């Protein structure tokens, strides 16, 4: 299924016979794999033995994003098992702030190992590598990232890791310790934010999406804004910790204390 998804992930028409030949599978096997992808929520159209994966929104432009986020390296994938897993596996080749960005992940997960639903090109899904002084509280780090996202998106935060819009979950944050090396805690921070979900999407809790704020929202613009705000807040946190200004902004953006 993952090989078929990779073939379809450029969202260009694919001829049935070409897919069978490239993947070395039979007609029945192709039909079974297509059915599994559709069951996973992917919108795959079929006409005259031609298949097309239809994205929820236009695919991201990794070159434009890399330019905007320089000097950090952006590792873009149309599909991957997990962005957190990618950062963890590549940690020895990354520098602080490098990130992995994906249109669709097949094994995404949230807090406590919960599966993270991931429509194709309907969210912002990314993870980045960060390193901090072990004397800094990890709880504080999660608060800082949550506030930065809420500031960038004009939304609310709910401790410990939820981003809310109109009282419904818009996104989440997952912070994991990779190792304690060279006097630093090396971390991977994973973030998922709903931008536009298909009407048929089934989620077990009330959810929100950024198209509620702006039906014409641009994912690239929002992604860059969110990441830049996160890195700015993290730099401030490393210098000043949780100070009075931060606490006031946290209260202002807290779902239960803000306006």
Where in the sequence are the language-model features?
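Catalytic beta-strand/loop module used to bind and position nucleotide/cofactor moieties
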Residues: 3-6, 10-11, 17, 21, ...
């Amino acid at each position: 299924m993952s090989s078929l998804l990779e073939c379809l992930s450029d969202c260009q028409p694919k001829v049935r016979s070409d897919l069978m030949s490239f993947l070395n599978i039979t007609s029945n096997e192709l039909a079974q794999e297509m059915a599994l992808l559709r069951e996973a929520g992917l919108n795959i159209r079929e006409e005259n033995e031609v298949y097309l994966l239809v994205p929820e929104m236009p695919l991201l432009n990794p070159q434009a994003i890399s330019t905007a986020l320089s000097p950090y390296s952006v590792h873009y994938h149309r599909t991957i098992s997990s962005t957190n897993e990618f950062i963890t596996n590549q940690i020895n080749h990354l520098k602080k702030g490098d990130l992995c960005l994906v249109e669709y992940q097949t094994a995404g997960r949230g807090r406590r190992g919960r599966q993270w639903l991931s429509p194709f090109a309907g969210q912002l899904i990314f993870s980045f590598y960060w390193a901090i002084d072990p004397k800094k509280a990890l709880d504080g780090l999660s608060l800082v990232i949550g506030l930065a996202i809420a500031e960038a998106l004009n939304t609310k935060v709910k401790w410990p890791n939820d981003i809310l819009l109109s009282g419904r979950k818009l996104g989440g944050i997952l912070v994991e310790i990779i190792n304690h090396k060279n006097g630093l805690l090396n971390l991977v921070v994973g973030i998922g934010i709903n931008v536009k979900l298909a009407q048929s999407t089934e989620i077990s809790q009330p959810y929100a999406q950024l198209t509620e704020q702006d039906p014409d929202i641009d994912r690239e613009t929002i992604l860059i804004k969110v990441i830049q705000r996160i890195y700015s807040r993290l730099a401030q946190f490393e210098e000043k910790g949780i100070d009075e200004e931060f606490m006031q902004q946290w209260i202002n953006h807290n779902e239960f204390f803000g306006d």
